[in-house]
Structures are given as structure tokens and as C-alpha cells.
Amino acid sequence: NMNELLLVLDFGGQYKELIARSVRANSVYSEIWPGNTGAEKIRELNPIGIILTGGPHSVYMPDSPKCDPKIFELGIPVLGICYGMQLMCHMLGGKVQPCEKSEYGRVKAHLKTESPLFMDIPEQNTVLMSHTDLVAELPEAFIKTAETANCPNAACENPVRKLYGVQFHPEVQHTDNGRKIIGNFLFEICGAKGDYRLDDYIETQIKKIREKVGNERVLLALSGGVDSSVCAALLSRAIPGQLTCIFVDHGFMRYREGDE
């Protein structure tokens, strides 16, 4: 794959697919990898940037998932979202503690628009918050770039090291201008070209399928769900005449849909 790559490191957040998708919607290819992927492996993958996802844990608990601390030394821009921001701040010497008042839902945030992350975004911007912990003290050399009524450090950055964090969720529709915030990270901070198209992905997958299948035949159980339908569509383009689909009626179709 010759496209530039944005790496999404997963810490168990429910929105990881949305993060990957909003990156791709900005024409940058993204892949989701486990949160504890080693810095050496990441250097090998050579991404233009890294996003740390949210997650249900508390960073100060001993069994909470951590990333390799060396990823902050690679010189690759990092954006921590929610748990990702707390994790970055915690690992770099900041202080994370429980909120006096948990924030859930749409909240008005006051943004410092001179931050490259918030370029061309209104100073007052409604964002989606969903957290029970907050960053009480930022690590050394980090500056605060956003606040809400209940969260003094709603975003932060260390521009010299290209480390950025947001406590809110820019990847969801409930955050105004969220896709633009992710776009700013990609284009203003990571220097992305935006060279990814879905057609490229289809071509890549078709090539992979042909290499794997060769002259063999493929038997596919097709339920009519998204996964097996997409798989069938790709296979029929990649290896026409080598594919046999068997319809699996699992009893969850609409009335008579299976017969149609």
C-alpha cells in the first residue's frame, strides 16, 4: 500500500471505527492497531501521525491499558482523544484525577483558535464530552488550548514535540466542526497530502484476493448482512467464475426477504 498512513491506536473506545472513518473521509488512509503496539513496529509502519483513542479505563489504575512510552519520542505527531489525551498527559508527567462532576453530552467549549488544531474553527464550539476523569495538571511544556465549564483542560498541546490532546470527541457528529478538527491534525500538523481514495482500497483488496486464491474456487456463506455482502461483491469482481455463494437464512431477515 503506497498511501500515506495514519495509525489509530485502540484503547477500547467505542468510537475507534468512527475515528478511522473520519480520517479516511479526509482522504487519508488509516488503520486501527492495538494500543500497546511497540514503537519499533510503529517506526517500521512509518505513519504520518498517530491517534490514541478513548476508552473506558482510568489511566491511574495499575491494570489500565498503556501505550509504549517511546511513541512520544519518535517525532511522529500524536493526537490523544479522551482517554488518549489523559494517557499521554499521565505518561509524560501530568496529573489525571476523577472529575468532581462527570461530563456527558454536548457541552460548549472555548477554544484557543491560534492552535493549529483549531484553525478556522469558531472560538465557541459545541463538543461531545463523555468522561469521568480529567487532566488536572498538564505535563511540563504543554499548554492548554480549550476549556469547558467543568473541564479546565479540555485540550492541550506541546507544539514543539507535535503532541496534541482533546478531552472531547471530534470524531462524532455531535461535535461541531469535528471532521475539520481531525482534518487540521492531518493537514496542518501531520502534513498529509490526502492521497487516499476508496477505489484504491478496492483495487488493493482485489489484488490481494487474486494472489491468495490463485486458480482455486471459493465457497462463501452469504447471509445478506453487510460483511458477507461486501465480501461477495469484492470476490465477484476479483475472481468471477471461481465463486460459489450459499445463502444462509439465519431467521433474522424481513418477511419473505430471503425468497426475493
Pin down the residues of each PLM region.
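RNA-binding accessory domains that recognize and position tRNA/RNA substrates
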Residues: 1-49, 56-62, 66, 72-74, ...
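Gly/Ala-rich beta-loop-alpha elbow adjacent to hydrolase catalytic centers
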Residues: 80, 84, 89
